[in-house]
């Protein structure tokens, strides 16, 4: 739930759960109305909801955890590519197996824990050649445990899930990926675009022939998080301008949180809004300790507080 504004109703899975804990504020935003326009694909694991925003593209959404992470299964005639594997709370490999039987490679938009939780389940995982990537591939427990705090979960966790042992499990990097690499899925080519900024290893994926751009955490509808120690604001600005230049050839922009589809024009507006933030032309409001939110032209950015705030 990468958005501080809370509105609608979340339906909990049992009256007992309702009695045990209050409904988290972010949960009241659900279900998001944008999903009504998308085709939903049934899968057996109820932790996930799967939607089809474009032909042979499946948005694998985790609505029951506050990150509302979205991974994408992109299917070609011979192979498939999974862009992000989510929180590692549900069984994402089981979901992908229900959607395709083609050989599958995993790529991550970046290696924050909410995007790599299911990596360990897959045999072939490519990663960017950065120390940040290698360090995160060792796994971690502390960050994962924070993600299942009571106010971070809407409803119940999956049957068989053990909160006490939950961690981001280590995974093996099968091969390194670089800017400009292409993945031939058979009748569909996916291009890797390095978009550092949010993290050093952030990437976007371009399906040029079909006009699809998968942006990870470089863009998604909601407050964009740029407050981590690994964030580089100059690199982020350069990356979003690079993506904005692609907008004329796009049909859809597909981000990694909240809602899976946005119009391509959002990229130019995003770049313009961020330029205003850097130029001191955005409204600043305090947020969590050490952080502020800048708001301008319908966008909001969570960033480290400037000196003196």
Predicted features by range, described:
Residues 8-11:
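Alpha-helical assembly-interface signal, strongest on the long, hydrophobic N-terminal helix that forms
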Residues 1-4:
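Positively charged n-region of N-terminal signal peptides that target proteins for export
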Residues 34-47, 51-55, 80-82, 87-88, 128-193, 199, ...:
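Metallo-beta-lactamase
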């Amino acid at each position: 739930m990468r958005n501080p504004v809370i509105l609608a109703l979340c339906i909990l899975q049992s009256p007992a759960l309702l009695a045990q804990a209050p409904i988290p504020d972010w949960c009241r935003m659900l279900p998001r109305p944008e999903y009504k326009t998308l085709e939903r694909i049934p899968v057996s694991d109820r932790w996930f909801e799967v939607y089809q925003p474009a032909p042979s593209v499946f948005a694998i959404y985790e609505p029951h955890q506050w990150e509302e992470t979205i991974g994408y299964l992109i299917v070609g005639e011979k192979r498939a590519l999974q862009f992000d594997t989510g929180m590692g709370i549900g069984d994402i490999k089981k979901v992908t197996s229900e959607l395709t039987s083609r050989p599958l490679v995993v790529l991550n938009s970046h290696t924050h824990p909410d995007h790599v939780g299911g990596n360990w389940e897959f045999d072939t995982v490519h990663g960017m050649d950065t120390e940040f990537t290698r360090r995160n591939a060792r796994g971690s427990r502390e960050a994962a445990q924070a993600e299942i705090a009571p106010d971070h979960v809407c409803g119940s966790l999956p049957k068989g899930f053990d909160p006490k042992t939950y961690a981001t499990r280590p995974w093996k990097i099968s091969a390194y990926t670089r800017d400009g690499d292409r993945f031939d899925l058979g009748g569909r080519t996916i291009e890797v675009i390095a978009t550092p900024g949010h993290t050093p290893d952030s990437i976007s994926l371009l399906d040029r022939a079909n006009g699809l751009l998968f942006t990870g955490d470089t863009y998604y509808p909601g407050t964009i998080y740029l407050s981590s120690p690994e964030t580089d604001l100059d690199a982020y600005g350069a990356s979003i301008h690079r993506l904005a230049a692609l907008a004329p050839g796009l049909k859809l922009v597909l981000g990694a949180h909240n809602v899976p589809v946005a119009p391509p024009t959002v990229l130019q507006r995003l770049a313009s809004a961020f330029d205003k933030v850097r130029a001191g032309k955005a409204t600043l409001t305090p947020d969590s300790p050490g952080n502020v939110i800048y708001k301008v032209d319908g966008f909001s950015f969570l960033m480290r507080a400037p000196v003196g705030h």
